[in-house]
Amino acid sequence: MNTESESFDKVKTECFRFIKSQETSKEKFKGKEKMLKSFLIPSCFWISSKAKSKHPFFLGIVGGQGTGKTTKSSILEIILKKYFKLNVFKISIDDFYKTRKERLKLSKKIHPLLMTRGVPGTHDINIMLDFFKKSKSRKFKPFKLPKFNKAIDDRFKKNQWYTLKKRPDVIIFEGWCVGAKAEKNSTLKKSINSMEKSKDTKLIWRKYVNNELKSKYKKLYDQLDCLIYLKAQSFSLLQKWRLIQEKKLWLKNKSKKTKNKIMTKEDVLSFMQTYQRVTQNMFKFAPKYASIIFNLNSDHQIKSAIYKK
């Protein structure tokens, strides 16, 4: 019989190696053994039991900026592959951002704020829907998926895109707004930050984003079989984590070609205001519909887990 302690012994080396690759000299990952034993491995047992009846099994992972979605989803991928022997494909909703050229066109047609990547409406929803459809096809054929380079705020060239060669058992689809739902139109009237107050005076931007969630994104998210929500304590904490994240990106991209695309502290805080409305709406409602909720402390650590279905 498979046990969680047995699985820990089999995956710990690879998981710890990955965690180490994400650390910096000043920032070390805390409580990694507890995270694996108490939370991520048990969740993989839960996921694998559900995935047996449906191929592919669409696993959504959502959390605000800097909650560790990429790190935690990568560890889940390692465990599901190494211990459960499942074919897993992981991709971020960030990889589906529209190109700079497409967002520029959108910003001129609808609202200038849509030049800034992030909110629903700035992703290529048709490619995402096509990705889900092709992944489910019984006559599966290999296909390519976009890869986004945040350092240049645009897609990588096609020869650097992902290739899905075989139909996966599990697809991990992670991102800050994965599974997000639209809010009531009445709540859109009140601005929640200085950006909305000064740059979206006619509510055009927030209504557009909300309508995207209500229609196209709902069609996509309704296809998720499970949603894991990484719940932070506050939006101000997310801002702090996002600044750390940007510093890491800067360290990785010191070349002259990309340096001017890395954001300053002021840029990050301004940038995050575009995320605030959807993120705060998820604080209120995602715990009601997520399948698994990981409550995080101020150090990114999972302090508790709730399994709902």
Give residue spans per PLM region.
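Post-Walker A helix-loop "phosphate-sensing" segment adjacent to the P-loop in P-loop NTPases
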Residues: 78-89
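Conserved nucleotide-sensing/catalytic segment adjacent to the nucleotide-binding pocket
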Residues: 28-32, 89-92, 96-153
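Conserved NTP phosphate-binding and transfer environment spanning the P-loop NTPase/kinase superfamily
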Residues: 2-16, 21, 27, 37, ...
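Phosphate-binding/switch loop-helix module in NTP-utilizing enzymes
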Residues: 131-181
